[in-house]
Amino acid sequence: MNCGRRMLLCALFFFTIAWAGPVEAQTEQGRVTRIAEIEIDPYQVEPYKAALREEIADSIRLEPGVLTLYAVSIKDHPEQVRIFEVYASQATYQTHLQSPQFKKYKAATQGMVRSLKLFEASPILLGAKK
């Protein structure tokens, strides 16, 4: 992905999370919000991104309880990936972890991931325009 497109995706991600007005605000009631901080082997960034794109597309399409999956990399550090995740409930999060597409992603990327940190998050306000 070229630098301009990566910058646009990062800008869209942070605009949506931090600056978008509450046109359709989500409440956190019952929802699970997580942030994943991932470091990828720099020599395997492109295969990792391909596997991640497939997993996100399939999860959003196939799992009604997967509400939001945003993946970005840190500018000038494509091996540093952050994923913002919102699930309808703890049960749908657990279902996602057992889904065929997530298991496929984990198996495919196992040797690519140098470190993984998961954080439970408490939304202040999640706003997005339709």
For the regions a protein language model found, what residue spans apply to each?
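Glycine-rich beta-strand-turn "strand-cap" elements at beta-sheet edges
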Residues: 2, 8, 15-32, 70-77, ...
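Acidic/polar helix N-cap motif
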Residues: 41-44, 77, 89
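N-terminal targeting signals for Sec/Tat export/insertion, comprising classic cleavable signal peptides
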Residues: 32-62
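An amphipathic, aromatic/His-enriched active-site/gating alpha helix that lines ligand/cofactor pockets
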Residues: 27, 54, 58-67, 86-120
